[in-house]
């Protein structure tokens, strides 16, 4: 779940740490901070998307990346990614084949003022999602995601829409 007393680093426009603050304060004041997203690919090319828990404080019930989360205060992006994978979808990080960074996104309104590193890996499951974090997991082809974004854009988180539009091809 997302306790309001989680502590995150506050960063400047160049993604340099300038302080730290509580999650609730950072979000309320729109301060710049950091996050990670992972797109998990099945061996057949489908992408696993996560439906955010209805108890989330930001964009509940919307489809987003396979895994996503904040970088805690004093933590590096890669460490946060490795922590979030077992927390959210219940698999050991070591079982994700080819885990690596694919693109960096600057903070903006669509990312909720988060600098984001997008990662990718391959894993075909099974998964054990944490119900306090994840309402569901589903595999989609890239074509299905493209079509859903046209016909059902409100079903997706703002961040996923932006990441998908600007994804490496």
Give the ranges of each region predicted by the language model:
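Short helix-to-loop capping/linker segments positioned immediately adjacent to catalytic or ligand/cofactor-binding
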Residues: 15, 88, 104-109
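Short, well-ordered strand-loop elements centered on a beta-strand within folded domains, enriched
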Residues: 17-21, 45-51, 126-130
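The catalytic Nudix box helix
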Residues: 48-49, 66-99
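A short, polar/proline- and glycine-enriched secondary-structure boundary/capping micro-motif
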Residues: 29-31, 58-63, 140-141
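A glycine-rich, hydrophobic loop/mini-helix early in the fold
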Residues: 35-67
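Nudix hydrolase/Nudix homology domain
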Residues: 22-24, 61, 73, 100-103, ...
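Acidic, metal-coordinating catalytic segment for phosphate/diphosphate chemistry
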Residues: 2-37, 43
